[in-house]
Amino acid sequence: MYDLLKTIDDPAALRRLDRRQLQPLADELRAFVLDSVSQTGGHLSSNLGTVELTIALHYVFDTPHDRIVWDVGHQTYPHKILTGRRDQMHTLRQLGGISGFPKRDESEYDTFGTAHSSTSISAALGMAVASKLKGDNRMGIAVIGDGAMTAGMAFEAMNNAGVEDDVPLLVILNDNDMSISPPVGALNRHLARLMSGRFYAAARAGVERVLRVAPPMLDLARKLEEHAKGMIVPATLFEEFGFNYIGPIDGHDLDSLIPTLQNIKELRGPQFLHVVTKKGQGYKLAEADPVLYHGPGKFNPAEGIKPAATPSKKTYTQVFGEWLCDAAELDARVIGITPAMREGSGMVEFEKRFPDRYFDVGIAEQHAVTFAGGLAAEGMKPVVAIYSTFLQRAYDQLIHDVALQNLPVVFAIDRAGLVGADGATHAGAYDLAFLRCIPNMTVMAASDENECRQMLYTALQQPNPTAVRYPRGAGTGVATIKQMTALPLGKGEIRRETSQPAGKRIAILAFGTMVAPSLAAAEQLDATVANMRFVKPLDADLVRQLAETHDAIVTVEEGCVMGGAGSACVEALLASGVTRPVLQLGLPDRFIDHGDPAKLLAACGLDAVGITKSIRERFLLSGAVGGQSSVKRVA
């Protein structure tokens, strides 16, 4: 099995194959991807759709000398397999295993790290310009999907690239949202070869030289050319950016891909190749439902993904989706906004019930935030459902367009904290730190499902921008109360009180997901636990009260320590004039790799065992409780 694939340990071996062997190789590679992902979980549909394109790129271009940048990067499993990582695929997205995205420190073939969308053209352009300046004759190649192509950053890069006449840049649009009928496919195969050929390029340049003496005639000739292309191919928009547009061609047809890429390799200046592929190609179940098979867990390929048993605990995403529908039922001003994450953010039901108030703005986080600001300015109640890691992309809009004008936009921040298999690129480690420093912001962290629901309702009542953060996955099992009640603004609650005498009293100030492990640790230590609820406005009175009645303070958060919730507590203590030893626990000052979330939290010392150990080492074993004032960060 996989006899041909087993001979390919790097692209050099691939390039030694006869062209007639490439389709059998593609069949083996697709089968290997399916078999591998079914055993580990991961992204499937997108990878099944890029098999032939990946083979063609490594066959035609001299990788890694020529640089391929894969936008988003979750479609790179065939690339990883062909570049020496076939035997590591069983470790995919696991602790200590290979990443599900390109990583520069994993392979020289991963020329640029990606995971967020629409960055590839900028990176490939930078590489191509560097090649031009150094004279090392390498091609910069960006492979970008039709969804990522909608983002502003992609067009900013296109606009910049179009003025670089002789830069060795190729942008490949991997369009998997349309299909080519056989007649059109045959016509476009012929057209792509024609438009990417040397004769066409030379003739085009010659006509331009002749007509340059008569600018009106040159403009007319260009318009006629665009019109001729426009009759049989889409997207002459890219010609306006200064690219030579080629395609669309069938991205599963190696006999079309390879000669077209070989022709493009000989051209200079920015080239744009439109390739049409199908998500889930070659696996009927994924072809029929590419969304279901986008990022599955382990499954039996022969049977497909079976409906999961109803879980005993709701996910926080489900809690948000139910709340949003309930809120919209009560108030016609409630608007739901997502930047291309309808399923992931739990908004499927909202779209069905309130289609006129549902807005999927595409992969455009900056626009999503300012769009929400405009709605809020006109009296609507916009709710932006966004992953923590993607909110980073709209930070200026958050400050300039929403907070500065004190507009009441609700930010429902999903995937806060560590996210597991997707790794550092998707971790929500920084939102507490970057939100709490913004004037006019209210910031809450949910400790369980019902608190999340009530916090979202509280946020909707505020006259200012408000954020509620909650983690990926299942909650704690707490039932949600249908009745929605606003929480007292900026007030935490005591969840457990110590029975220790003076001199041994420790108070743990826990935020969001860290309340549960802090309570478990407190049982071992007999410590007080406060569920702080609000990061901003912080319950400074509660912080001061606990400091006055305890001998040491511990802050615990699933976020970066520097500038985070613990820092807010230290600032409050300093302002109150009460000094106590403080231990700040949180995510370390490094990027956390992929792996099982529970194992990652344990490795960071943020499970009950780790919290207990850190407190004992800092205070109880060292005898620091009751000693001189100090602050220590454990991260």
From Swiss-Prot:
Binding partners and assembly: Homodimer.
Family matches, as HAMAP family: DXP_synth
Taxonomic superkingdom: Bacteria
UniProt: thiamine diphosphate binding residues: H74, A115, H116, S117, G147, A148, N176, Y283, E365
Cofactor(s) annotated in UniProt: Mg(2+); thiamine diphosphate
One GO-annotated biological process of the protein: 1-deoxy-D-xylulose 5-phosphate biosynthetic process
Name of this chain's protein: 1-deoxy-D-xylulose-5-phosphate synthase
Pathway the protein takes part in: Metabolic intermediate biosynthesis; 1-deoxy-D-xylulose 5-phosphate biosynthesis; 1-deoxy-D-xylulose 5-phosphate from D-glyceraldehyde 3-phosphate and pyruvate: step 1/1
E.C. numbers: 2.2.1.7
Task performed by this protein: Catalyzes the acyloin condensation reaction between C atoms 2 and 3 of pyruvate and glyceraldehyde 3-phosphate to yield 1-deoxy-D-xylulose-5-phosphate (DXP).
